[in-house]
Swiss-Prot record:
It comes from Helicobacter hepaticus (strain ATCC 51449 / 3B1). Its cofactor is Mg(2+); Mn(2+). Pathway: Cell wall biogenesis; peptidoglycan biosynthesis. Residues 134-337 form the ATP-grasp domain. Keywords: ATP-binding, Cell shape, Cell wall biogenesis/degradation, Cytoplasm, Ligase, Magnesium, Manganese, Metal-binding, Nucleotide-binding, Peptidoglycan synthesis. Pfam families: Dala_Dala_lig_C, Dala_Dala_lig_N. This is D-alanine--D-alanine ligase. Cell wall formation. GO terms for biological process: cell wall organization; peptidoglycan biosynthetic process; regulation of cell shape. The gene is ddl.
Length: 350
């Protein structure tokens, strides 16, 4: 099976998406049919596989590549005789941050009837906004850390105790994130987060907690639904991954080691993953990052499009992607009818 990779987008994570796409090329190799770049002007470009290097984009030379356009069922390119479809494959949405994870691209691909791997509109909106994610997780029976919402109109903490972590509500990759240990540090952290978003989430910061990452998706095996789980990773013990470390994290291609944890904890993490995934993220390969505090599992965040789609957590990443591509959700078909208009005209004719 071949995949087309859509990357770029207009977001603070634009460069990360490029790095992620270059890494995915190393992992998928000949399984990639086309690379499609969405630039900062929302124009699509067809990038030759042998040109997929980060310098192409930073230099602006990507504009020398073929510009392509969306039509129903396919991307097309202009020719002397009109528009010619590019052979379509299952598309991988690899746009991190806004455009890719906020539901914009999902809506566009759905509208033009292009099959794609990635979060759908509702799950994009829910997971892109950290406040919505907290509400969603609580409704699904998954625990979250204590938090408050700060806005420009109401920027004051009410009850949460220091230390805290401040995050822009709609941003990833540790951009605009800071740990606040005491009140005198609050103004700086708040100003930093407000540079990126008008809403901030303030969470209790627990140092020394165990953190585990688990990726996966749901597919069908015959008539049965089954989950394809990755191994569970215990990430770096560094207090907070800064942007540069997250940037490098998105370029990973070597498989990591399974965390040394009990089978009971594995089952707990997988159970919480399923609570979040079911009837929400079908068609997407997601990664959930969890905290474990006093043997209780808490959701840290949902990554609806993890860096290089968390290939480094899977033993058979291509196999999982292929299974998922054959199990994409189908929209209910709506038959448009004009019977009421016809009845009105018929009645008027009388």
């Amino acid at each position: 099976m071949k995949f087309d990779v859509l990357f770029g987008g207009v977001s603070f994570e634009h460069e990360i998406s490029i790095v992620s796409a270059v890494a995915l090329k190393k992992v998928l190799g000949e399984s990639i049919g086309n690379f499609i770049f969405l630039d900062s002007s929302h124009r699509f470009y067809l990038i030759p596989l042998d040109s997929m290097k980060s310098k192409l984009f930073s230099s602006g030379d990507y504009k020398k590549c073929t510009e392509i356009f969306l039509q129903r069922g396919a991307f097309v390119k202009k020719t002397f005789f009109g528009f010619k479809p590019i052979i379509p494959h299952t598309l991988i949405n690899l746009i991190h941050g806004a455009d890719g994870e906020d539901g914009s691209v999902s809506a566009l691909l759905d509208f033009y009837h292009l099959p794609f791997i990635g979060p759908r509109i509702e799950s994009s909106v829910m997971s892109f906004n950290k406040v919505f994610t907290k509400i969603f997780a609580a409704q699904r029976g998954v625990k979250v850390l204590d938090y408050e919402i700060l806005t420009r109109a109401n920027p004051h903490l009410k009850h949460i105790a220091y230390p805290i972590i401040l995050k822009p509500a709609r941003l990833g990759s540790s951009i605009g994130v800071s740990v606040i240990n005491e009140e005198k540090e609050l103004d700086y952290g708040r100003d930093l987060a407000f540079e990126y978003d008008d809403t901030i989430i303030a969470e209790s910061f627990k140092s020394g907690v165990k953190e585990y990452n688990l990726a996966g998706c749901r597919v069908k095996n015959g008539s049965q639904d089954e989950y394809r789980f990755s191994i569970i990773e215990e990430p770096s013990k560094k207090e907070l991954l800064d942007f540069e470390r997250k940037y490098l994290d998105f370029s990973r291609t070597a498989q990591v080691l399974q965390a040394d944890i009990s089978s009971a904890l594995v089952a707990k993490l997988q159970e919480n993953f399923m609570k979040l995934y079911e009837n929400a993220f079908e068609g997407a390969l997601i990664r959930c990052d969890f905290f474990v505090i006093d043997d209780e599992v808490y959701l840290n965040e949902i990554n609806p499009i993890p860096g290089s789609m968390a290939n480094y957590l899977f033993e058979d990443f291509v196999g999982v992607l292929t299974e998922l591509a054959y199990n994409l959700p189908k929209k209910h078909s709506i038959k448009v009818s004009y019977k009421y208009i016809e009845q009105i005209h018929y009645a008027k004719g009388k």
